[in-house]
Curated annotation (Swiss-Prot):
Encoding gene per record: HAG2
Source lineage: Eukaryota, Viridiplantae, Streptophyta, Embryophyta, Tracheophyta
Recorded superkingdom: Eukaryota
Enzyme Commission identifier(s): 2.3.1.48
UniProt-recorded name of the protein: Histone acetyltransferase type B catalytic subunit
A molecular function (GO) term: histone H4 acetyltransferase activity
Amino acid sequence: MVQKQQASAGPGTEPKKRRRVGFSPADTGVEANECIKIYLVSSKEEVDSSDISSVKPVDLNDFFDGDGKIYGYQGLKINVWINSISLHSYADITYQSTINGDKGITDLKSALQNIFAETIVDTKDEFLQTFSTQRDFIRNMVSNGEVMHAGATDGSSKNAEVVPSDPQVIRMEIGSPNAGLLYSRLVPLVLLFVDGSNPIDVTDPDWHLYLLIQKKEEKEDPLYRIVGFTAIYKFYRYPDRLRMRLSQILVLPSFQGKGLGSYLMEVVNNVAITENVYDLTVEEPSEKFQHIRTCIDINRLRSFDPIKPDIDSAVQTLTKGKLSKKAQIPRFTPPLNAIEKVRESLKINKKQFLKCWEILIYLALDPIDKYMEDYTSVITNHVRTDILGKDIETPKKQVVDVPSSFEPEASFVVFKSVNGEEANTNVQVDENKPDQEQQLKQLVEERIREIKLVAEKVSKSGQTLKV
């Protein structure tokens, strides 16, 4: 290698200074979950109050690109205040210093606007003013809505009034005046508190909002605020029916555990019945909501007389002998006419009813400990069927080639196997079968745990579901 020579410095010459190469300092960043806190407040006095606790949203890291971290700040703290009256928000951002490290500096304003959109205001003073200037926002927005009840709808479609004593549900078509604007302010709550949810299409008239409204009497005019809501889509089912699909449901964190979620679901169930839709479905329910929904449906089914003989028949069969010792275990699924009766009368869809059916049988077994082994065998059979995606007990068609001098490529016979077992002696055993059996066992244990939790809750007489 040829090196470039440098002229030697004379005795009276100062040595040349070396250029320093600058490197950006390493910045490990901070997770959004660690530095952002969310507060729901209903008055300006609650802002910055030590008596107000933060609420836990979904994973905030998901709102920040890449690894979910915020870069370029030391000692970063972000307190986001949400006005539960007007649904405006304000972010109080503090930090010790900024560091323009190897990851740059996160644009906090842009990141927060991706969540809160037009609801976020720039200054604290502007935010505090919304408690007075936007005091009647909810009241004005829902004035043309339809008041719904758990027992029946009153049919009114204008000038909806809320009874002060109890929260009530007001329905609004998304295409109606004010509904789109109102939902746009609800979107941040959807993103923050409904896991995996996306905003609905406000241009699609088949969407309906069911708003859980609380009316609070004050010295001035009554104060209206939203404590929960659900978004439901109606779609066509051939030849002449509609189905209802519940897509989003939320009770604000500070109002959870008071039975409001159960009341909202009771209203929705009643709407499905009174409007005679085909059935009510739920889009990708969370584990928590599925538990609530199942508890509600179990109570409805326990008082539904047409299926009681079917439950008794299934229980009698299960208690006759040691099912766990039998080669073929009956499915213990409800008869088709029971499924149809439940769908037509209660609007519970087949998939949900099958889950409830297992719990109804569990509740009817007395004493449960005596029959738990056989019951577990039934649940194992159900779980295995769910995994396979088909009924393992249904006779399967098999094709077997047979010798023929007429047309060898087209010579075969078709027959149904006995008890759903394939008559093939060359069955290959999956090398991972022990792992599959262990996974099956874990799934069964999880299903049994869910069944017991629901059964315990609904068995407590006189207890109102606090969800």
